[in-house]
Regions:
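A flexible loop/linker signature enriched in serine peptidases of the S9 family
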Residues: 19-25, 39-44, 59-69, 77, ...
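Cysteine-rich, disulfide-stabilized extracellular repeat modules
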Residues: 12, 33, 52, 77, ...
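Beta-strand-rich domains and repeat architectures in extracellular enzymes and scaffolds
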Residues: 1-29, 45-47
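Intrinsic-disorder/low-complexity regions
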Residues: 1-2, 51, 84, 95, ...
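Blade-terminus and WD-like Trp-Asp/Gly-His loop motifs, strongest in beta-propeller folds
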Residues: 8-13, 47-55, 91-99
Length: 136
């Protein structure tokens, strides 16, 4: 991948993950061959590596509207974490790598109004919880 359009980089230690060709790719920080992490998830965006480097949260459009997905940072199957049917963007993680932070316009009258939420990074995802701050 010498030429291309690389978007939304996220870095943890010696690993860089980025979006290109509507998929997630991983490459060592010092350079080398990029490895495709996703395929068949529709358009993907906004990746965020967890602070411990074990997990990768991102937004995928496999079934239409963007939703939050989670996969091991090394690659493998992705799990859909939200079922909001509204626009969303992964913002990052809590420092302990247990909660994914994301913004969404679900439940808002104006589609441009977003709020910040968390969802557990565990297998079942858990409940979407609002972060007690103003609109994003």
């Amino acid at each position: 991948m010498n030429n291309g359009y690389y978007r939304f980089p996220t870095i943890h230690d010696e690993t860089i993950v980025f979006v290109s060709e509507d998929d997630l790719w991983s490459v060592p920080r010092q350079g080398g061959v990029a490895r495709r992490l996703t395929s068949n998830l529709g358009e993907v965006n906004y990746p965020a590596l967890s602070p411990d480097g074990e997990w990768l949260a991102f937004v995928g459009r496999e079934e239409g509207m963007p939703e939050v997905y989670l996969m091991a940072a090394a690659g493998g199957s992705a799990r859909r974490m939200t079922y909001l049917n509204h626009s969303c963007q992964v913002l990052g993680w809590t420092p302990d790598s247990t909660q994914i932070l994301f913004s969404t316009n679900t439940g808002h009258f104006h589609p441009q109004e977003y709020a910040i939420y968390t969802i557990s990074g565990e297998a079942n995802g858990g409940q979407v919880m609002p972060v007690p701050v103003g609109p994003a």
